[in-house]
Structure formats: C-alpha cells, structure tokens
Swiss-Prot record:
Predominant subcellular localization, coarse grouping: secreted
Protein name: Interleukin-10
Native source species: Macaca mulatta (Rhesus macaque)
Gene3D superfamilies noted in UniProt: 1.20.1250.10
Glycosylation sites per record: 134
Family: Belongs to the IL-10 family.
Cited PROSITE patterns: INTERLEUKIN_10 (PS00520)
Keywords assigned by UniProt, alphabetized: Cytokine, Disulfide bond, Glycoprotein, Secreted, Signal
Disulphide-bonded residues: 30-126, 80-132
Example of a GO biological process term: negative regulation of oxidative stress-induced neuron intrinsic apoptotic signaling pathway
Length: 178
C-alpha cells in the first residue's frame, strides 16, 4: 500500500515539475523570437527567390497589388490584423492557385507556404505580436483587386511576395521596438 502511494506522489511531483518548465520554454521562445525573426525572414526570402522569376515573368500587369496603404495598416493600429489576414490570404487563396500553374514550381511554392505557416505559428505563440481580431480595409482592397484580376491575380500576388515580406519585416521591427 505504501509503495503505490509513494508511486502516486512521485508521478504527481513529476507532473508538477514538468508544468513550469513548459511555460518557461514557451516564454523563452517568445523572448528569443526577435532574435530569430531575421532568420525566418531570410528563409522566406530564400524560398521566394526560387519562384520569383517565374511569377514576375508571368506578371504582365503594370498596377501594384500591395499598395502603400497596406504598409500603413501594418504600421498602424490595425497592423496585427492586417498581417494576420495577409498571411491567411496568401496561404488560402494565392499559394494554392500558384502551385497549380507549373509542376516545376509546385514544390517551391509549397516550401514558401510552409515557411509562412511557421512564421504564423510563432507569431500566434507569442501573443504580443498577433493579438487581434479587427478587419483591415487595405487587406480587403488587396483581396478585391486580386479577385478582379482573376487568373492574372496569382501572378501579380506571387510576383509581389517580396513586398509582403518587407511589410512583415516593418511590422515586426515596429513591434519589437515597442
């Protein structure tokens, strides 16, 4: 009887000891996040460089999809929501279509999407970087313009992915400094 009670106590104590360690690990990953951000942005840029030429050659339109108003939203009070919506837009609307345009680039677009998913996951874990729910008008404008461009919208959105990375960087730099 005593040995089973002792075993229960050990299991309970092990569980109690493990819990604070998990919280510390999460906190540590958030404190290290600003230092890891340049690496994550570099990974995004490297992945994009593998498809950039393909999409920019196919993009025959003179207009800009990712306008300055989007960057202003990223820098303003809607920054969190604008970033969240744009990541979702690229992952759910742009990249699935982009993967289907050429079998040679499908793997590279998929890799780019995985890097973007990793960034989104890390942002969500560190709530100070993505604590939002409001809608961004600039993101709605991007989505509407994308829809109007129909098939050409994929080329436009993918050819401007580097601008999106720059906007992510501007938002994150601002959040880290605050």
């Amino acid at each position: 009887m005593h040995s089973s009670a002792l075993l229960c106590c050990l299991v309970l104590l092990t569980g109690v000891r493990a819990s604070p360690g998990q919280g510390t690990q999460s906190e540590n990953s958030c404190t290290r996040f600003p230092g890891n951000l340049p690496h994550m942005l570099r990974d995004l840029r490297d992945a994009f460089s593998r498809v950039k030429t393909f999409f920019q050659m196919k993009d025959q339109l003179d207009n800009i999809l990712l306008k300055e108003s989007l960057l202003e939203d990223f820098k303003g009070y809607l920054g969190c929501q604008a970033l969240s919506e744009m990541i979702q837009f690229y992952l759910e609307e742009v990249m699935p279509q982009a993967e289907n345009h050429d079998p040679d680039i499908k793997e590279h677009v998929n890799s780019l999407g995985e890097n973007l998913k990793t960034l989104r996951l890390r942002l969500r874990r560190c709530h100070r970087f993505l604590p939002c729910e409001n809608k961004s008008k600039a993101v709605e404008q991007v989505k509407n313009a994308f829809s109007k461009l129909q098939e050409k919208g994929v080329y436009k959105a993918m050819s401007e992915f580097d601008i999106f990375i720059n906007y992510i960087e501007a938002y994150m730099t601002m959040k880290i400094q605050n």
